[in-house]
């Protein structure tokens, strides 16, 4: 699972 905080917080 890849989580990002920029530009929006989301996990794929």
From Swiss-Prot:
Subcellular location: Secreted
GO biological process, one term: defense response
Source species: Hoplobatrachus occipitalis (African groove-crowned bullfrog)
Cysteines engaged in disulfide bonds, as pairs: 3-11
Expression sites (tissue/organ): Expressed by the skin glands.
Residues forming coiled coils: none
Gene Ontology annotations for the cellular component aspect, listed alphabetically: extracellular region
UniProt name for this protein: Tigerinin-3O
Keyword terms, alphabetized: Amphibian defense peptide, Disulfide bond, Secreted
Lineage: superkingdom: Eukaryota
Main function: Stimulates insulin release from beta cells at a concentration of 100 nM and release of glucagon-like peptide 1 (GLP-1) from enteroendocrine cells at a concentration of 1 uM in vitro. Reduces secretion of interferon gamma from peritoneal cells in a mouse model. Has no inhibitory activity against Gram-positive bacterium B.megaterium Bm11 or Gram-negative bacterium E.coli ATCC 25922 at concentrations of up to 100uM. Has no hemolytic activity against mouse erythrocytes.
């Amino acid at each position: 699972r890849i989580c990002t905080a920029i530009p929006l917080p989301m996990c794929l």
